[in-house]
């Protein structure tokens, strides 16, 4: 289906708006940042936990990068939510196109009788 065949409606506008938000997200990183206790230290250490090829891995995060890595993981969660929104609006556009085509075919069939 070419883009010109899609009539602009609320789903098209919402999808375009969400795509613009995705473009502004910035750096992202999949995983969870978790503190762990270090012997003899009052401050916790930090690990990034993530899945790779079906296995869980952890990566030590130096203290000077913790704030930045937290932001990256938050950006990743936000990105996933935005992708779900784009998907929902794209499915709605497909559903609307199919419904419009069925209605047009139905009215043609009634007119030809």
Model regions: which residues?
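A positively charged, amphipathic N-terminal helix/segment that binds anionic biomolecules
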Residues: 1-113
């Amino acid at each position: 289906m070419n883009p010109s065949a899609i009539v602009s409606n609320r789903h098209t506008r919402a999808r375009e708006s969400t795509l613009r938000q995705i473009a502004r997200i910035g750096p992202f990183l999949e995983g969870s940042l978790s503190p762990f206790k270090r012997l003899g230290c009052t401050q916790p250490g930090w690990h990034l936990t993530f899945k790779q090829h079906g296995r869980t891995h952890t990566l030590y995060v130096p203290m000077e990068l913790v704030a930045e890595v937290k932001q990256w993981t938050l950006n990743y969660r936000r990105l996933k939510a935005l992708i779900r929104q784009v998907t929902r609006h794209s499915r709605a556009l497909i559903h609307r196109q199919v419904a419009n085509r069925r209605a047009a075919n139905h009215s043609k069939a009634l007119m030809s009788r």
